[in-house]
C-alpha cells in the first residue's frame, strides 16, 4: 500500500455493555461521557466522528458508546428516550445529560461545565 494511503486509526472510544459499565464506568475516577446511540440513527452517525475527536483530545475524559439496541437496560437506567443522548457521569453520579445532536463546541462547553 502506498504511504499516502496508510491511515492510523486511534480508537479512543470503546463500546461497552452493561457488565463493563457496572465494573469500570461507575467506579471511574474520571469524568465519563456516555454516548447513547443506534446504528440506524442519522444524527448519531453525524455525531460519531465528533465524539471520536473529543475523546482523542481529552485524555482525562473517559468516553464510551452504548448501542441502545444491544444494551437497552443501560439506556432505561438513564431514561434515554431519544438518541443521540450524551450523559456525563462523575463518581457514578449523573452530572449532565443532553439529548440530540451537539456540535463539538457544545460538547466542549458541557465538559467544562461538568469538571
Can you annotate each of these PLM segments?
Residues 1-10:
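Short, Lys/Arg-enriched N-terminal segments with co-localized hydrophobic residues
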Residues 14-31:
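A short beta-strand-turn-helix
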Residues 29-31, 48-66:
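Conserved helix-turn-beta segment immediately C-terminal to the redox Cys motif
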Residues 30, 37-40, 82:
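Short pre-active-site segment immediately N-terminal to redox-active cysteine/selenocysteine motifs
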Residues 72, 78-87:
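Structural micro-motif
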